[in-house]
Structures are given as C-alpha cells and as structure tokens.
C-alpha cells in the first residue's frame, strides 16, 4: 500500500471516530461554526427564529390616550349601515354612551400594523396618563409553513399522545393554563387539533354562561367559530371602541389595557361579514343587546391582528396572576419551551424537550379526568363522549336535556349538566 493511500485511510478512520474530541470531523465542524459566528449578522439572524417576537426599536408605535371609551360607537348603527333592522333590542341605554376609561395603571399593550407588518408595543405605566417606565416593541414574524410542518410531523410521530390530548379538550378535561398554551399555538396545528381546541373553547364559554360572565349569544358565536379563537378568552365586558375611531378597539380593565388596530373597520364588516349570519334565528329573537352586536363586530373586524394580541398578558394582569405567570421571552407564547419550535434549525433534543412538555399537559388532563371520575361516581360510555363536563355543548336548555333523557325533577335555571366522563 502506498504512502498516499495509507494517509487517506488514516483520515477516513478519524472521520469515522466521531467520539474523539480531536477527530477530523469535529475539528472541521468547529472551524465552520467559528467562521459563521464571526459574521456580525449571525446572532441577529439566529434570534429572528427564536420566537414569533422580534425585538425592534425602529418603529414608532404610539396611540393617542383615550380617557373616554364606548361599547359601540354612537355613530355606528346596524340599521343605518345595512338598510334593514335585525330586530335587535337595546337592553340598556348605557351601551351607547361614553364610559370613563377603567384603566388605573399597569401594563399597556398596543397592536398596530405598519407596512404590512404587525407590531406589539408593551409599556409599563403607573397610571392612565402616558408615563412609561419601561417599553419594548416587537414585530410579529413567523415562518408559518415551517412551524406548521414541524408540528404536523410531531403530531404524526406522537399520534397517541396527540389524540389523547384532543379527546381531553373535546370532553372538558383540561386546566385553563393548558388550554391557553395550546390556543396560542392554534394557527400552527393540524385541522384535527384545531377542531378539538374549538370544542374546548365551546366548553369554556358555556361554563362562563352559567356564571353569567358570557351570554347565550357569545356561546352561539363560538359554536359558529366566528373570529379568532383566542379572543374568546377575553371577557366581552372588557372590550370597548375608541371614541369616534371605529378602526380601533380597546381591551381594558383596572390593571391592563391594550389598544388594537382592527384589520378592517366595523363598517366594512357589517357589509361583508355580517350578512352571512344575519338570517340566523338568533338574530330574529329580539334578545340581542347593542353591546353584543358591538362585540360581534369587533370579532369580525379584528381579523389576523388577533395573532399579535398577547392574551397571556391580559390574563396575567386580571384573573390569572397566580396561575399563569408572564414569561418575558416571547409575548405571543405562554411558555419559553414553545419558542424553540420557531427556530429555523430545530435539533432533535429540542423537540424532545417540547414532547416532554406536551406530555406534562397530557398528564394534567389525565389527573383532572381521574378526579372528575371520582367526583361523578360513574364512567361515561365510550360511545357517549359528546357531552363535555359541566356545560352546554349547544343552546339546549337544561329542561330540554332532562326531558330528552327522561329525568324528572329538573329546575328552571342555567346550572351545569350533571358531570359525565
């Protein structure tokens, strides 16, 4: 064997031995990494895919302070815009009047579109006056096909876990933090997972109907899947419109405020989207308030701008402060581990970490299912999984439910159905 051939064999042996620290392959890899890292733009390009939020300071995102808000702009009339009456009755004269901005101090977010890009500005304020203590501007930027393909492959590989979590969503065995996390990932999931999340949201809203935080009209809207799914986590009573500016809306309470630029004005929504639903029987019942119509127009008008609304900021500063902490790494996600799936090159160990987090959510749901089984005292047949726990899956009243199942002794109220698994 010649000397040159012997040298070539030595190199091949070194390439094959990847376990050696000074192997030819490892040396070459380190050199390539050092070359790319020496590029000043490497870190910025790498960070671009760390999460949907790309921090930027080059865009001016400001909105005039709104001291007065309204539930529905007084100049916006369904009858005037459509040329016909929908039979809507105004329940309270307060709905058309101006309301003092309830925000007293805390976190303020602004969602705005500039040059076909969505931006979110987060500001810490000590009062409703514009006195920012700390602020940050993010651009919402996602390689949608990449993330959808990645999560599709994940659910295909982990089909059993995916189906199990979907079943728990569909039957009401979930905690609110688990629901919030996966609702924020809704746009990147497969159609089957999206369908289960809508079923979970129907359960969530129906439970809120029984506690008088939502109405039957809101339940009808979520059943029709109107608008962006995450906006159903916002209490309808916290949604306002700007005074004299129908292209802007506000979501606010005493400790949180978000000013959102709508994707299309309510006037456009009335003419383009509302006619699809105006012939529904619920619109002829004459029980819908003007405030509910205003909320519907908000849901139809916000469009894809809802993707940039940080729902976890709203919840963390209102009812979920002790349950859902705000993670500063990305304002569009609820957990840091979710940022990893947005990287351009996701390593196998990263998806394994995400799988473990997915498994934790599944374990939480299974524990809730076990507790509900013990509480109810009996198992629901496998073929009868259409009725979620403690809620209405349709506009069927409790009386109708008892009559359909031939159960005597019903009461005329809106308490939940008997728990069944």
Swiss-Prot record:
UniProt-recorded name of the protein: UPF0300 protein C737.04
Organism domain of life: Eukaryota
Protein family according to the UniProt entry: Belongs to the UPF0300 family.
Subcellular location: Cytoplasm
InterPro entries, sorted: Meiotic_expression
Keyword vocabulary terms for this entry: Cytoplasm
The keyword Cytoplasm is assigned to this record: yes
Annotated Gene Ontology cellular component terms: cytoplasm
A Pfam family assignment: UPF0300
């Amino acid at each position: 064997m010649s000397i040159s051939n012997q040298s070539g064999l030595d190199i091949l042996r070194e390439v094959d031995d990847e376990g050696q620290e000074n192997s030819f392959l490892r040396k070459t890899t380190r050199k390539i990494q050092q070359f790319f890292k020496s590029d000043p733009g490497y870190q910025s390009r790498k960070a671009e895919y760390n999460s949907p939020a790309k921090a930027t300071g080059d865009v001016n995102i400001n909105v005039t302070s709104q001291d007065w808000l309204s539930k529905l702009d007084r100049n916006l009339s369904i009858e005037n815009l459509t040329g016909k009456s929908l039979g809507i009755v105004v329940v309270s004269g307060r709905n058309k009047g101006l309301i003092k901005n309830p925000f007293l101090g805390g976190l303020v977010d602004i969602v705005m579109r500039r040059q076909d890009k969505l931006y979110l500005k987060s500001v810490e304020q000590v009062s409703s006056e514009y006195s920012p203590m700390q602020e940050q501007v993010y651009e919402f930027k996602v390689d949608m096909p990449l993330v959808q393909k990645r999560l599709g492959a994940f659910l295909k590989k982990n089909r059993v876990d995916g189906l199990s979590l979907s079943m728990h969503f569909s039957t009401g065995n979930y905690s609110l933090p688990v629901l919030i996390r996966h609702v924020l990932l809704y746009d990147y999931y497969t159609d089957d997972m999206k369908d289960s999340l809508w079923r979970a949201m129907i359960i969530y809203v129906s439970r809120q109907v029984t506690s008088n935080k939502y109405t039957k009209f809101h339940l009808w809207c979520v059943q029709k899947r109107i608008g962006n799914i995450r906006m159903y986590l916002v209490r309808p009573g916290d949604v306002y419109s700007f005074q004299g500016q129908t292209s802007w809306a506000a979501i606010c309470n005493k400790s949180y405020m978000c000013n959102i630029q709508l994707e299309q004005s309510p006037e456009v929504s009335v003419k383009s989207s509302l006619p699809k639903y105006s012939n529904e029987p619920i619109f002829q019942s004459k029980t819908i308030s003007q405030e509910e119509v205003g909320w519907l127009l908000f849901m139809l008008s916000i469009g894809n701008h809802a993707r940039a609304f940080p729902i976890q900021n709203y919840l963390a500063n209102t009812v979920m402060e002790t349950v859902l902490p705000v993670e500063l790494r990305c304002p569009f996600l609820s957990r840091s581990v979710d940022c990893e799936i947005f990287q351009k090159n996701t390593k196998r160990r990263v998806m394994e970490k995400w799988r473990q987090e997915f498994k934790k959510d599944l374990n939480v749901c299974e524990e809730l299912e076990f507790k509900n089984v013990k509480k109810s005292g009996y198992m629901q047949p496998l073929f009868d999984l259409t009725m979620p726990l403690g809620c209405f899956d349709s506009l069927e009243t409790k009386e109708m439910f008892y009559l359909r199942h031939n159960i005597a002794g019903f009461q005329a109220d809106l308490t939940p159905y008997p728990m069944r698994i």
